[in-house]
């Protein structure tokens, strides 16, 4: 839908909640206003921005690491050292295993999720306007963490690591006993234990992904509502205070995702 065709606040809000989608059957862009979304579509805007932000993280940290000095650090080096120290302290406090992968993983998760969340602070119409008028894109959403597919995919990656460390530390037999003999240590309760432990295990990635998605989707929606329902001269009254408050939200959600990942992997790494 072109900007000139948007005549009501409802159309404006709906336009900004549509993803740029690729039909995997025809490999053509989907016009969200012509046909409803199906299973065989890929949200390429979410994929694009998540990959780009991941590359920004890698390039930025690599450049700072290559140019780091033992003397008085610059502002960027000092900021990155502060982030690394903060993440490392959390890993030392919460993870009691011996893996050397957890700290880099936690750092990657924290910075990557923060960068994806930070996209919510960009002017709501800036990148969609550029995409529509210069690239001819029918829709564009720029906050990857407001897409449930992205957050659940990240949570699925954490879930795979939970299973990996559980089996690595406890063995197949120990992990099986954990699923079948807890909380009731009697063979007659194996079906009940399996259901309870299975639900508990599956709830970890589901809650991890949906928590991040829900908070970021709500934040994005509030920005869209402010822009769509209020006249331009009064939008600053609400958007600026909400943006300031939203800085806390995007940082907190990145921190929570990181902390829960560390805790889940620490629990999986405990030997029984």
From Swiss-Prot:
One GO MF term attached to the UniProt entry: proton-transporting ATP synthase activity, rotational mechanism
Regions crossing the membrane: 41-61, 101-121, 147-167, 221-241, 243-263
Family matches, as Gene3D superfamilies: ATP synthase, F0 complex, subunit A
Domain of life, source organism: Bacteria
NCBIfam families membership: ATP_synt_6_or_A, PRK05815.1-1
Subcellular localization(s) per the UniProt record: Cell inner membrane
Role noted for this protein: Key component of the proton channel; it plays a direct role in the translocation of protons across the membrane.
Coiled-coil residue windows: none
One biological process term in Gene Ontology: proton motive force-driven plasma membrane ATP synthesis
Protein name: ATP synthase subunit a
InterPro entries cross-referenced by the UniProt entry: ATP_syn_F0_a_bact/chloroplast, ATP_synth_F0_asu, ATP_synth_F0_asu_AS, F0_ATP_A_sf
Family: Belongs to the ATPase A chain family.
Keywords, comma-separated and alphabetical: ATP synthesis, Cell inner membrane, Cell membrane, CF(0), Hydrogen ion transport, Ion transport, Membrane, Transmembrane, Transmembrane helix, Transport
Topology versus the membrane: Multi-pass membrane protein
Pfam name, any one: ATP-synt_A
Biological source species: Erwinia tasmaniensis (strain DSM 17950 / CFBP 7177 / CIP 109463 / NCPPB 4357 / Et1/99)
Keyword Zinc-finger: no
Predominant localisation class: membrane
GO CC annotation: plasma membrane; proton-transporting ATP synthase complex
Assembly and oligomerization: F-type ATPases have 2 components, CF(1) - the catalytic core - and CF(0) - the membrane proton channel. CF(1) has five subunits: alpha(3), beta(3), gamma(1), delta(1), epsilon(1). CF(0) has three main subunits: a(1), b(2) and c(9-12). The alpha and beta chains form an alternating ring which encloses part of the gamma chain. CF(1) is attached to CF(0) by a central stalk formed by the gamma and epsilon chains, while a peripheral stalk is formed by the delta and b chains.
